[in-house]
């Protein structure tokens, strides 16, 4: 069927129209980021600190704050556990707390098939970061070393993780990457197929 054809195209790299650029603001000392956009909506994000660990009051799920895009939104790392809508989350260093407005949706990150290229932007200058293999990343002796990131590895789990090295040394660098995403599946005759005419 069409879904098998789409999977075959993705495997052969024929779905170039699904490439999109993603920008993630880096946080000091955090080296694992989602392979796409991942945010949580809370009552207020102003009292939380970038880099601190959030903990769910009832779920005990945890994630780190990578940036604060708005007064009610937190960009986060991939959670350990599952945050539940309506629970109170608290910050590990700031002591701030807020109510989670909706469950964290991993769909955007899980649609990532591959990361084709990446750069780190510092002071309006883009610096290329090199892709390394799983074994090369594993063999880095001191993964907590900090500096301007110059290598990345995409850990292709169900929810892909972008691992960078060295760990960022500030909260202002931005990683920009071109990711290849999954073609939206066809499940009803009323769907519009996510394919170009030519």
Predicted regions and their residues:
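Autoprocessing Asn-cyclization modules and mimics
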Residues: 16-103
